[in-house]
Every structure is written in structure tokens, then in C-alpha cells.
Amino acid sequence: MRILSSLILLIALAIALVSATRPVVLMHGVTTGKESMEPLKSWIEESIPDIYVLNVEIGNGAFDSIFTTMDSQIEEFAQVVQADPKLANGFNLIGFSQGTLIARAFVQRYNNPQVYNYISWNGPQGGQFGTPFVNIPWVDKVLGTIPYEKTIQKKLSVAEYWKDPHRIDKYLERSIFLADINNEYQVKNTTYKENLTKLNAMVLTYSTNDKTIIPKESGWFSFYADGSGTEVVPLQQQTQYSEDWLGLRTLDESNRLFFYTTTCTHRDHPIEDYCKPYFTNFTLPYLQN
């Protein structure tokens, strides 16, 4: 009888452990679709048996990732995750490149279902200032010349997080996305900070060999000093941090903000197997709690 009771207890415990494994949602980057995240999906499923992983694609993938506004992409992302009953009790969230901004904006604006751990792979968190970026010549030319024209802001997703350190006033006046989700406007959105500080963990990574995200340290919210295209100001030395506009200082001081670097090139995340150790060391631990 005792053996039977112990067996039943072990089975119940195993079921509880499986059910306690939080689902994971993936959000791809610009100029790609969800197929680019399939290797990461496989790594997760191999590492955590029976886990549910949702690999989200916005619209038709590559085309819509460029020519759909960021707000529309975020709304579609929210609709997809909110319609999935397997995510109703919350999930962990991984974004890559532009997808890191879509994912973070979901946390700040919705956070329903709740996101527990947010993991940013090589994202332009502090902004983007450098071409070639999308490797479409006319798009890169527009980014380098007229990114803040109203029609461009409403037509090109990548223009919405273009941050020209030589034209900060124009950026703050015309940016319809990044200046908003980074809480850079004079009137702060308190909901953004409230939702972001509910995270158990925020994980930020950038690649020391990244030639796509410029500056590469933007993955850590670091960015060029106003008026400079060379001097990079670390997050902790920015007003963003000292005044805690988004809650990043709150997360940091409560040991919930984590910083990592990789050596894979931008496009090798998350495709090439030689990048897998970074997944194992810097991502997997945050999918198991």
C-alpha cells in the first residue's frame, strides 16, 4: 500500500512539474519570418521536454516586418498570444532584433497574459543609427536622410526606432514609437514602468561582433551621446536610468536585470549551432523558472 501511495505521489509530482513549466513565446526580427526562429524553438524543446513553444509570425513575415507599423505589429502580436489558451497563465518571452522591441512593448502596454521573464537577443533597445541595416538600398537611404518625415514614420517600421544623436530634438518630436516605449517624452507613461517592473527577470544581450545593430551596445540600452556618433553612453550613466523612466533601475537594484554578450554575428542568432552555447548559458536558465 505504501509503495502504491508513493508511486501515485511521484506521478502527481511529475505532472505538477510538467504543468508548472511555463510556455515560451518567440518573436522574430526584421526582414525575416518565424522560420528564422525555428532553430531556437528546437533548442528549447530539446532542452525542456513537453514545453509549449509558440513561434509568432506577424503578417506574412519578412515583408510585413518592414512595411507594417510597429504599433500594428504589436497589436497583432497581442491578439495572437491572447487568443492562445495555453498561454493564459503567463509565459516567458524571447525576442530577436526588431522582435525585442515588439516583445517589450507588449509587456509595457498589455502584459496580459503576464510575461515572467523577458529575454532580448541583440535588439536595438536604445535605438538604431547606422546603415546598411535592412540591406534594401532605398530603405537604407531613406533611414540615412529623411527617417523623421511623417509618411516615412508611418510606412517603415525601422524608421520608428531610428535615433539620430545629431537630431535629438527632431527624434523626440517625430518618433512615433521608440521615444514612446522608452518613455522619453516629457510626460511619462506610468503604466509602462508598472508593467515592466512586474518581470521576474529582464535579460539583455548584444554581440561584440554585431555589424547590424549600431551601436551594438544598444542591446543593453546604451546609446550614442547627444551630438556624437562615436561616444557610447552606458545605460547606468543615462537619465533614463537615474530617473528610472522605465523601471530599469528598479529591476537592476532588485537583481532582476541581467547583461550578457555573445560573439556570434547578428544574423547567426539564433541560426548557427556555434551560437547554441549562448542559448544554453544565457537563455535556458531563465526558461526554467
UniProtKB/Swiss-Prot annotation:
Task: Name the InterPro entries on file.
Answer: AB_hydrolase_fold
Disulfide bond residue pairs = none
Provide GO CC annotations from the record: lysosome
Going by the UniProt annotation, this protein carries glycans at N189, N195, N281
Q: Where in the cell is it found?
A: Lysosome
Instruction: Please name the catalytic residues of this protein.
Output: S97, D210, H266
Q: Which domain of life is it from?
A: Eukaryota
Q: Write out the GO MF terms.
A: palmitoyl-(protein) hydrolase activity
Q: Which UniProt keywords apply?
A: Glycoprotein, Hydrolase, Lysosome, Signal
Q: What is its main location?
A: other
Query: What catalytic activity is recorded?
Result: S-hexadecanoyl-L-cysteinyl-[protein] + H2O = L-cysteinyl-[protein] + hexadecanoate + H(+)
Pfam families of this UniProt entry? Palm_thioest
Tell me where the signal peptide lies: 1-20
EC code = 3.1.2.22
Tell me, in a sentence or two, what this protein's role is.
Removes thioester-linked fatty acyl groups such as palmitate from modified cysteine residues in proteins or peptides during lysosomal degradation.
State the family it belongs to: Belongs to the palmitoyl-protein thioesterase family.
Annotated protein name in UniProt: Palmitoyl-protein thioesterase 3
Which organism does this sequence originate in? Answer: Dictyostelium discoideum (Social amoeba)
> What gene is it encoded by?
ppt3
